[in-house]
UniProtKB/Swiss-Prot annotation:
Main location: cytoplasm
Family: In the N-terminal section; belongs to the ThiD family.
Biological source species: Schizosaccharomyces pombe (strain 972 / ATCC 24843) (Fission yeast)
InterPro entries assigned: Haem_Oase-like_multi-hlx, HMP/HMP-P_kinase_dom, PM/HMP-P_kinase-1, Ribokinase-like, Thiaminase-2/PQQC
Cellular compartments per GO CC: cytosol
GO function term, MF aspect, one: phosphomethylpyrimidine kinase activity
Protein name as it appears in the record: Putative hydroxymethylpyrimidine/phosphomethylpyrimidine kinase 2
Known pathway: Cofactor biosynthesis; thiamine diphosphate biosynthesis; 4-amino-2-methyl-5-diphosphomethylpyrimidine from 5-amino-1-(5-phospho-D-ribosyl)imidazole: step 2/3; Cofactor biosynthesis; thiamine diphosphate biosynthesis; 4-amino-2-methyl-5-diphosphomethylpyrimidine from 5-amino-1-(5-phospho-D-ribosyl)imidazole: step 3/3
Subcellular location: Cytoplasm
GO biological process, one term: thiamine diphosphate biosynthetic process
Binding site for 4-amino-5-hydroxymethyl-2-methylpyrimidine: 76
UniProt keyword annotations, A-Z: ATP-binding, Cytoplasm, Kinase, Nucleotide-binding, Thiamine biosynthesis, Transferase
Length: 551
């Protein structure tokens, strides 16, 4: 990337850890300094549709830092399981220890636990690290029908892990297996009422909460098992020992879908990591899976569908705190930006060869422009709705007024009186530019106002910083005072403040809105160039006074 003095001056100004206000995946504003964290302890799925691959995709797409401890390596795809290579219990514990030792985590989910010894290892770790939100997905049968566990595993799961569990998430076949292992009969599940009875039985095994998933049994509007082509629903039941909560969603006639159980449990864990209540986490998790099924990508050869874990991802091509770098190097922005910050008007100004009438004309128009620049900040204050933001807009107005006083003083030193400034007629370029700013601010939001003013605010510092490094600059030249005014700590502080506002705003915007604002930035940049070009053409080009060094 070519040298830009702005990057150097703003380095370390936008440490993401300092941004305390963030949006969670549901759009809730949350105050926090760090990413939420969750750990998945499960088997792998080389095809990416289930297991830890699905877990980590889900956590990432929901804004959670995901860690994993692999229990088994599974050669499978949506069509079935080919083979399983089990990890040693000691190695599973070692993975968990490595994760938690470095990144503390209390929201943990489990998936496929390949042996009784691995279940015991996970239970030991749960006690050792006090997993307060342990979500257990009792993976027993693959979507394809392949068995993934033995009877011994079920016994140890019931006896050692479920009593430590915050939420267990069996589907109906898994719930039947869990209950049968303890000598409890919950077969013949044909209605929502039967599901409630089943959930209550599973609750007796020790977990604090049971989420019985109803995806294997669509029901009609009476809550009865049905396969008719009618308005079928899927009902998931959450039981806390006292109350049943029903979560109803439309039944998607997609056939078999690979990885829904893994994805739901990891989604619930993710929302718990965001500190949502359990009922919220369950509802949000169901909604996430519903969307992932709805947008199932038709890319696999197996008849079983796969999930689209990325339905909620919105890709932006910049990291938090680095948007200014991104926009100034954006291929659509660069041509207009380069023309603006490298204009021959500024080069001749720094060299001292710019005709005085050209500079005087610029000073007059800039005075009129500052009036409208202050009006724009006032408009921003009107559009804000919090005291800190209103105050910040007011401070920007004050800064422009202070800049105006310096401007009047500078004008006087170049033979332009205050009366000259007040009686000056606004040029078409100044009128077009300033009214574009005000019109954009009136018609759009605060973000648009920040972007339409940004080329002026940022550009003047960038130009001054560039000119200070140019070999052709005349430090004793007649216009060095102008360069000094915009290459000073006071002005840089204003630039930093404006850039920080933009950096914080863009984190809340969609990619589409960001692109719209970039286009506003480009147009405002072109108006800035026109602001140089008007006096340059009138007093340099038309008079054949161009400096050959810049031709």
């Amino acid at each position: 990337m070519p040298y830009n003095p702005l990057y150097e001056s703003l380095s370390n100004q936008f440490d993401p850890s300092r941004i305390e206000t963030v949006l969670d995946p549901m759009g809730y504003t949350i105050k926090r300094r760090a990413l939420p964290v969750s750990l998945t302890i499960a088997g792998s799925d080389c095809s990416g549709g289930a297991g830890i691959q699905a877990d980590l995709k889900t956590m990432t797409s929901l804004g959670v830092y995901g860690m994993s401890a692999i229990t088994c390596l599974v050669a499978e795809n949506a069509g079935g399981v080919d083979s399983v290579e089990e990890m040693s219990p000691a190695f599973v514990e070692s993975q968990i220890d490595c994760c938690i030792r470095d990144i503390p985590c209390h929201v943990v989910k489990t998936g496929m636990l390949g042996s009784p010894e691995i279940v015991k290892a996970v239970a030991r770790s749960a006690k050792k690290f006090n997993f307060s939100k342990l979500v257990v997905d009792p993976v027993m049968v693959a979507t394809s029908g392949d068995s993934l566990v033995t009877k011994d595993i079920v016994s140890v799961l019931n006896e050692e892990l479920l009593p430590l569990t915050y939420l267990v998430t069996p589907n109906i076949p898994e719930a039947i297996v869990l209950a049968k292992n303890q000598g409890l009969d919950i077969s013949n599940i044909n209605s929502v009422s039967d599901m409630e009875r089943c959930a209550a039985v599973i609750h007796k095994l020790g977990p604090k909460h049971v989420l019985l998933k109803g995806g294997h049994m669509p029901v009609n509007n009476l809550g009865l098992k049905s396969s008719d082509d009618e308005d079928l629903r899927v009902v998931d039941i959450l039981y806390d020992g006292n109350r049943f909560y029903h979560f109803s969603s439309s039944y998607l006639k997609k056939g078999e879908v690979h990885g829904t159980g893994c994805t739901l449990s990891s989604a619930i864990a993710s929302f718990l990591a965001w500190e949502h209540s359990l009922t919220e986490a369950v509802q949000f998790g169901i909604d996430y899976v519903h969307g992932a099924i709805t947008h199932s990508p038709p890319i696999n050869n197996c008849s079983t569908n796969i999930l689209n874990h990325m339905t909620r991802l919105r890709i932006v091509p910049f990291a938090p705190g680095h948007f200014i770098e991104y926009i100034l190097s954006h291929p659509q922005v660069v041509p207009a930006w380069k023309e603006y910050i490298n204009h021959k008007f500024t080069n001749m100004l720094a060299k001292g060869t710019l005709p005085l009438p050209a500079f005087q004309d610029y000073l007059k128009q800039d005075y009129l422009y500052l009036v409208n620049f202050a009006r724009a900040y006032s408009l921003k204050g009107y559009k804000e709705n919090t005291f800190p933001n209103i105050l910040e807009a007011a401070q920007s107005v004050i800064h422009v007024i202070e800049e105006k006083e310096l401007h009047v003083s500078m004008c006087s030193s170049y033979g332009v009186s205050l009366q000259d400034l007040k009686s000056c007629e606004e040029s078409p370029a100044c009128t077009a530019y300033s009214r574009y700013i005000l019109d954009t601010g009136a018609a759009q939001d605060v973000a648009a106002l920040d972007f339409v003013q940004a080329p002026c605010l940022i550009g003047y510092y960038v130009i001054a910083a560039r000119l200070m490094k140019e070999p052709f600059r005349n430090p004793q030249g007649p216009y060095q005072k102008w360069v000094d005014n915009y290459f000073c700590e006071d002005y840089l502080s204003a630039v930093r403040r404006g850039c920080r506002q933009i950096e914080e705003i863009v984190l809340k915007l969609s990619p589409e809105r960001i692109q719209e604002l970039i286009e506003i930035f480009i147009r405002a940049t072109k108006f800035e160039t026109l602001f140089w070009e008007t006096p340059y053409y009138e007093y340099v080009t038309k008079q054949n006074l161009e400096d050959k060094e810049f031709s």
